[in-house]
């Protein structure tokens, strides 16, 4: 596998996973197929990112992450991408973290309705001070 996995200096339970720039560069093309907005509204886009990441690591990254997180002797993984280049912008990092989250489980899953949902923020436009209004709460759009 093209990953360096080492124990963290603070605890052996924390595993540092270092992802090399060479592997990150392989993700630029598949990540460019999806906009941040498509990640919010299209569940398949999120799964596609996860598949692209796992393919770069020959299907071993998802197994490794799940093994670390489910093992009582470890349980924590810190992923450190080797980013020395400006082509890895904040959108790339959002896509990387979204894909990594989907390798581990099913984020944005509503168990009550058994559906995935996109999350978006609502800008506060009401100037009243009613405690009933919670302007900065997330609204969920079920798909």
Residue ranges of model-derived segments:
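Non-heme Fe(II) oxygenase catalytic core, chiefly the N-lobe of the double-stranded beta-helix
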Residues: 2-143
């Amino acid at each position: 596998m093209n990953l360096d996995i080492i124990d963290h200096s603070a605890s052996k339970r924390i595993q540092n996973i270092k992802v090399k720039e060479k592997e990150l560069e392989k993700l630029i093309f598949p990540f460019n197929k999806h906009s941040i907005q498509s990640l919010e509204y299209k569940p398949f886009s999120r799964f596609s990112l996860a598949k692209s990441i796992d393919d770069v690591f020959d299907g071993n990254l998802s197994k490794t992450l799940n093994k670390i997180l489910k093992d009582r002797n470890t349980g924590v993984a810190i992923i450190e991408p080797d980013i020395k280049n400006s082509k890895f912008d904040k959108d790339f990092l959002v896509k990387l973290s979204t894909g990594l989250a989907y390798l581990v489980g099913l984020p944005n899953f509503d168990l009550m309705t058994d559906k995935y949902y996109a999350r978006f923020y609502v800008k506060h436009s009401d100037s009243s001070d009613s405690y009933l209004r919670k302007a900065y709460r997330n609204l969920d759009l079920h798909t």
